[in-house]
Amino acid sequence: AGGFKEPHWDWSVEKFYHHWFASDRHMLGLLDELGWRDKVLFPRPFTVMYHQGKFYPFDSILKAILFPGLGWGVHKARFGLVGLYLRLTNNWQGLEAHTVDAWMRKWAGDFVYQLMWQPLMNGKFGERYADQVNMAWMWARLKARTTRLGTYTGGFQAFADQLTAHLRSLGVNIHFSTPVEQIEPQPAGGLSLRIAGQSVPYDQCLVTTSPGQLARLAPALPPNYLQGLLELKSMGAVVMTLSLKQRLSEQGYYWYNIPKSAGFPFLAVVEHTNFVSPEHFGGDHILYCGDYLETDHEYFSLSQDELLKRFLPPLQRINPHFEPGWVKNAWLHRTAYAQPVPLVNHSRNIPAIQTPVPGLYFASMSQVYPWDRGTNFAVEIGRRAAGLMG
């Protein structure tokens, strides 16, 4: 949830676009505790879906009914009934034994699945995992999310900075840019953290990295626990952020969902300043172009200039008047751990928060299942971990 800020901006911009939902009770509850709820904004942005060369609004029940791709017959009825069932049921345990691919083809039908859901799965999980993800993931996505999207006044970096200052005022020591190299249990109890070549003793340690990073940090974990960590799959993310001289979407659309089959070099285009005003960014129009990818994809090795040459021309398919000269600045951010991949019966494979090493705890986005990753569930699992640590 890190951000960055240009000198002429009043607000920060996130490196990897995200937002809160109106249903995010853990995150909003924390903000209530801190007395900062009044700084949460819930604008009403517009989301669109690509179909046969055009973009159509798709962010409400009415817009879904009017979406031309489904027609007016049985396909639209099956789409609506499946969506209604998934919102009403709480039996995610029964769903996780089935893949999204198999379950949706059976109940929504091949046509509806291939038009509406398969592009999402291909975009999120790539060719390797798209047909392996279990149905509980889709259930949780539809169950928890709302059309209202929230952000924090000043940007999420402003929230992080305020929280840091608040914690320090309570006597909490926070060390930035201090990477831990290894975590080792001590014979007399407790843990030793190697930091900059020095061993520092601690009674307890909560690791919040990816599962693979924990395995590298704590090789003293039992082999079966280490193997379980390394078997968990995830997708990386590549996000290009652009500041433009003028708005890209003439209609004021915020989120463009783009299927891989459409031939765009990214999964989504998100015009942040159609969500919050460009006045917060000195009049700049902020645009994200992002994709979920496996870490061996070429986007993880191409330079920013090489990616710009690929990303800019397709923007003319959104606005034919777009020109590269509109771009004032660009920033490229990549992460190897962005989207956990929950396979069939994933609940059996989730590592416990309390690891087999006394005093060592683990809380990550791979453990908030069946829910999808997000700051809301980071707060929830953080509270659970704190309760276990006493």
Predicted segment positions?
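Mid-domain catalytic core of redox enzymes
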Residues: 179-287, 292-301, 305, 310-321, ...
